[in-house]
Curated annotation (Swiss-Prot):
Keywords for this protein: Catecholamine biosynthesis, Decarboxylase, Lyase, Pyridoxal phosphate
Coiled coil segments of this chain: none
Stated name of the protein: Aromatic-L-amino-acid decarboxylase
Impact noted for substituting residue 117 to A: Decreased specific activity to L-DOPA. Increased specific activity to 5-HTP. Decreased ligand binding affinity
Organism (species): Drosophila melanogaster (Fruit fly)
Binding locations of substrate: 117, 227
Record annotation: effect of changing residue 428 to F: In allele Ddc-R33
Family to which the UniProt record says this protein belongs: Belongs to the group II decarboxylase family.
Assembly and binders: Homodimer.
Pfam families from the UniProt entry: Pyridoxal_deC
Annotated InterPro entries: Aromatic_deC (IPR010977), PyrdxlP-dep_de-COase (IPR002129), PyrdxlP-dep_Trfase (IPR015424), PyrdxlP-dep_Trfase_major (IPR015421), PyrdxlP-dep_Trfase_small (IPR015422), Pyridoxal-P_BS (IPR021115)
Length: 510
């Protein structure tokens, strides 16, 4: 064996480059702890729990949008990290001084932008435990509980939605679920699995074609209302994606088939289609029962993106919107949007994960273990290697709320949206821009896009509520999303009064 020299990078100088004294490793006292001790941690954690509870229970009183300008934070903190440890009490004081002035309060009942991001006390506590265990569950052996709880939780969740048995690990077939970070990751993972599947199929039919030639012919499909992450998945996957014109904001099977047939006639190879259930712009639902069979007929991988609306499928009255799910190859929704599970927790199911596993399979010796094949190694199901113990918060939320209370949460939000919609149509100045679906209301002032742009600017400028816009077929409108678990009927009345007051101001200034 060749001689391996001992590292000579241990500092021997009395001072570093800045003139500060170096401490020789042999002079460090091993009995002196550099960590926060358990009693101090308990005091710190109890104080933080009190702060969190006070913050959330009184979040309604805070201005939903911060008034700071870019760069506000840097002058509030030192230019460099402290040489000596500070007191945790000082850190707590700086939360209000440094952090809170720049926070947009997503869990305020006055926050109506985007779609909700979930939050609950059980999920917060679960994240504390996950942080304490601090495992990186890329393989079964890296932390068996991390993998096995995820398998079971994905089956629990799939049963709550009444997904076909082929998607569930408990069915004994190929299928199973995995927790991804976001719906964007799920869309990309599905695309890469579909790409690998189609490459294999085409190579068997045309062994004379090289991979570059085949990839240049692949084309995928989505509605013109699909999320921007679908287009991004195509860019990252190095394939063409074609936008299919929607009908009343929804993709129809006939339009998808026409696009496929046109591309086949031009020598392209269709391989993948994303069907959106609950679009970001207006919460519209593609016709899965039409598009799925079309995709199956042409041997496309059908991926269903139900990032927001999927949570509602735990309620029987909304499951008709996922009619045709048996035709899908993969299905995704985000419990971290609407099911009271803190970010990040994006649930994805695959009928045949082997296409994804084989596409991502890089198997160095240091990641191998004796139990390979007996349980999933989730590193093969995702883009990154590392993964947190995310199943804990799903387990805590499902147990501590129960299905009935989660259903009640969804239904409350849907009723609040109807309440706001009723207030809107009762004012002759306003109109709905789309059908009210789930917890989203799309509305606008009658008249020009410019009037509505001015209205939104005025609403957000007042800072009492926060909305974002959307545009479909050159019609600009405002989106009122019900986002907070603290929302009450009175909050919807307050938000409507803010919208109405902003419109009043515009009229007075004309």
């Amino acid at each position: 064996m060749s001689h391996i020299p001992i590292s000579n990078t241990i500092p021997t100088k009395q001072t570093d480059g800045n003139g500060k004294a170096n401490i020789s490793p042999d002079k460090l006292d091993p009995k002196v702890s550099i960590d926060m001790e358990a009693p101090e941690f308990k005091d710190f954690a109890k104080t933080m729990v009190d702060f969190i509870a006070e913050y959330l229970e009184n979040i309604r009183e805070r201005r939903v949008l911060p008034e700071v300008k870019p760069g506000y934070l840097k002058p509030l903190i030192p230019d460099a990290a402290p040489e000596k440890p500070e007191k945790w009490q000082d850190v707590m004081q700086d939360i209000e001084r440094v952090i809170m002035p720049g926070v947009t309060h997503w869990h305020s009942p006055k926050f109506h932008a985007y779609f909700p991001t979930a939050n609950s006390y059980p999920a917060i506590v679960a994240d504390m435990l996950s942080g304490a265990i601090a495992c990186i569950g890329f393989t079964w052996i890296a932390s068996p509980a991390c993998t096995e709880l995820e398998v079971v939780m994905m089956d629990w969740l799939g049963k709550m939605l009444e997904l076909p048995a082929e998607f569930l690990a408990c069915s004994g077939g190929k299928g199973g679920g995995v927790i991804q970070g976001t719906a964007s990751e799920s869309t990309l993972v599905a695309l890469l699995g579909a790409k690998a599947k189609k490459l294999k199929e085409v190579k068997e039919l045309h062994p004379e074609w090289d991979e570059h030639t085949i990839l240049g012919k692949l084309v995928g499909y989505c509605s013109d209302q699909a999320h921007s992450s679908v287009e991004r998945a195509g860019l990252l996957g190095g394939v063409k994606l074609r936008s299919v014109q929607s009908e009343n904001h929804r993709m129809r099977g006939a339009a998808l088939e026409k696009a496929i047939e046109q591309d086949v006639a031009e020598g392209l190879i269709p391989f993948y289609a994303v069907v959106t259930l609950g679009t970001t712009n207006s919460c519209a639902f593609d016709y899965l029962d039409e598009c799925g069979p079309v995709g199956n007929k042409h041997n496309l991988w059908i991926h269903v993106d139900a990032a927001y609306a999927g949570s509602a499928f735990i309620c029987p009255e909304y499951r008709h919107l996922m009619k045709g799910i048996e035709s899908a190859d993969s299905f995704n929704f985000n419990p971290h949007k609407w099911m009271l599970v803190n970010f990040d927790c994006s649930a994805m199911w695959l009928k045949d994960p082997s296409w994804v596993v084989n596409a991502f399979n890089v198997d160095p010796l240091y990641l191998k273990h004796d139990m390979q094949g007996s349980a999933p190694d989730y590193r093969h199901w995702q883009i990154p290697l590392g993964r947190r113990f995310r199943a804990l918060k799903l387990w805590f939320v499902l147990r501590l709320y129960g299905v009935e209370n989660l259903q009640a949460h969804i239904r409350r939000h849907c009723n609040f949206a109807k309440q706001f919609g009723d207030l809107c149509v009762a004012d002759s100045r306003f109109e709905l821009a789309a059908e009210i679906n789930m917890g989203l209301v799309c509305f606008r002032l009658k008249g020009s896009n410019e009037r509505n742009e001015a209205l939104l600017k005025r609403i957000n400028g007042r800072g009492h509520i926060h909305l974002v816009p959307a545009k479909i077929k050159d019609v600009y409108f405002l989106r009122m999303a019900i986002c907070s678990r603290f929302t009450q009927s009175e909050d919807m009345e307050y938000s409507w009064k803010e919208v109405s007051a902003a419109a009043d101001e515009m009229e007075q200034e004309q």
